[in-house]
A protein has these predicted regions:
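Feature captures eukaryotic membrane-trafficking machinery centered on endolysosomal pathways
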Residues: 150-152, 273-308
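Primarily short, surface-exposed interaction patches in extracytoplasmic proteins
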Residues: 1-8, 49
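C-terminal, non-catalytic macromolecule-binding modules
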Residues: 180-183, 214
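Non-catalytic, conformational "gating/processing" segments within enzyme and secreted inhibitor domains
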Residues: 13-168, 188-271, 275
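Extracytoplasmic/secreted cell-surface and envelope-processing proteins
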Residues: 1, 170-172, 206-208, 260, ...
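Short Gly/aromatic-enriched secondary-structure transition segments
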Residues: 2-5, 107-116, 173-181
Length: 308
């Protein structure tokens, strides 16, 4: 499991998670909640660790109980995550993140118009969407591969990061090459520029099984009935992870969203500021960033928008 999480040692990962939980208490726009619903009584050591991460522990009774928790913690945005509860299920681990932010610079509502968006693998045709538009100063960077812009929210040092690969690049190929080191370099290359930005207005809800993703990351043992080892929470080693479900709701509108370096100073005559244009009319990445968190862990939400 540690291999899947980037070879961090357990103590370091625990410290990072606690730092994130502490920081989230200061947020007014983002809420983080954890819960454990179990059909057996876990070991005391496990319960102590759960308490450290402010995770509630409840008796597992029904799918309705799980869905009610999700509905409450996401303010009604995710009302159901389970259709039914398998009789063999003995534990469910739950994590919920809820975010609602207002743009520091709101998009003018009268500037929103109907425009084309080209979905992934459907480039020959387009769908009509509401496209928001704004001309403002934002942190921005572009090169031959991509455009990246940062839109700040009004509170909590939160901002949205939007990365748009160039038209000739498949977004899935782009993501394969986008590691944390490259992302940090992109963030550092952004400068305050005048940007003519067009961004889709959208509301999405999507659900996915994460089993295959986690197994490919090296976290295969917990899913295997033979190799899974959860003796840290239960004396009898007779449990394993069956499924990991992620369900996400995302809304973006005009008001917001529910190393060597050389510096050269050149003095020249004043000129008209350069303006950049960024039209997000094809698949893109949407991230939520909190600058108060450790550098490699400041992205609290990451999503790929393929279809609108």
């Amino acid at each position: 499991m540690l291999l899947a999480l980037g070879n961090k040692d357990l103590e370091e990962l625990n410290k990072i998670n606690i730092d994130i939980l502490k920081a989230s208490k200061e947020f007014t726009t983002i809420e983080i909640a954890n819960a454990i619903m179990t059909a057996f009584t876990p070991k005391d050591n496990f319960l102590n660790v759960a308490s450290k991460y402010e995770s509630t522990v409840e008796d597992l009774k029904s799918a309705a109980q799980v869905n009610n928790w999700c509905n409450l913690k996401t303010h009604g945005k995710i009302a159901k995550i389970l259709e039914e509860l398998d009789p063999n299920t003995v534990m469910i681990l739950l994590n919920a993140i809820y975010f609602k932010g207002t743009w520091q610079k709101e998009f003018p509502q009268n500037a929103t118009s109907t425009k084309a968006f080209y979905n992934l693998n459907e480039e020959s045709k387009s769908v009509k969407i509401d496209m928001m538009s704004i001309k403002e100063r934002f942190n921005y960077y572009e090169d031959k591969e991509l455009q990246i812009v940062e839109l700040p929210y009004t509170k909590d040092s939160m901002s949205a990061i939007i990365i748009l690969p160039n038209k000739d690049t498949n977004i899935n190929d782009f993501i394969k090459e986008l590691d944390d080191e490259k992302l940090q370099k992109l963030l550092k290359r952004m400068y305050n520029e005048i940007v003519n930005l067009e961004l889709p207005k959208f509301e999405l809800e999507f659900s996915s099984l994460l089993n295959d993703v986690l197994i490919k990351m090296g976290m295969d043992e917990p899913f295997n009935q033979v190799t899974a080892d959860f003796t840290g929470m239960k004396d009898l080693n007779d449990i394993y992870i069956e499924i990991v479900i992620q369900k996400t709701y995302l809304k973006v509108d005009e008001k917001g969203t529910e190393a060597a370096d050389v510096t050269s100073v050149v003095i020249n005559t004043k000129s008209i500021p350069i303006e950049f244009s960024m039209t997000v009319d094809r698949p893109f990445l949407f991230m939520l960033r909190n600058k108060n968190l450790p550098q490699n862990y400041e992205m609290v939400f990451m999503s790929k928008i393929e279809h609108l």
